[in-house]
Amino acid sequence: MRYVLRYLPLFALALVAACGDSLGIQASAANKVDTVSMYALSKTPVATPSAYNMSFGAVVRTDGFTAFDFAFDIDSTGRALLLPTGPLKLGRLSGFQVSALAFDSIRIAPSGRYNLDSALVVDVNTVAIAQSRPVTCPNGLPGAYYAKLHVLSIVDSTRRLTMEILDDTNCGFRGLQVGVPRS
């Protein structure tokens, strides 16, 4: 028992040093900006992609595929909404923050204050930062994915939202610049 207690502080210090913001792993994928379109959950064919999976960095369909981080819909009053998992009754897991910064000026995702409980009302030129559902990173530690997005257009007649998104698909990294992130 004394042996364990003697080395416990050293182990704790090593664990903290290894983790940091990137959970002690190296980034392997370069961040890039992509332009994607999502269709409203309601009043569109089920075969159209209505959600986004941040670990894949791709839009996904919601029929039979519940592993997504946020979805798009248009409510009965005509407001365009980005929905994290909370309002969809899938658990308070993913979330958004609206940003006052321009899309290109966002360099790193904040570490907290994501809205997990309610829809984000968006319009053309809305800029937001997204945090994914909690995941287990390749090193076995808990983490999340982060992305910044900029709404480019919302077409009411087709119920389609188009946005540019930079999704850091390196688990646990918060860097939101083009290229391989360092943190």
Question: How would you name each of these model-derived features?
Answer:
Residues 1-17:
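Sec-dependent bacterial lipoprotein signal peptides
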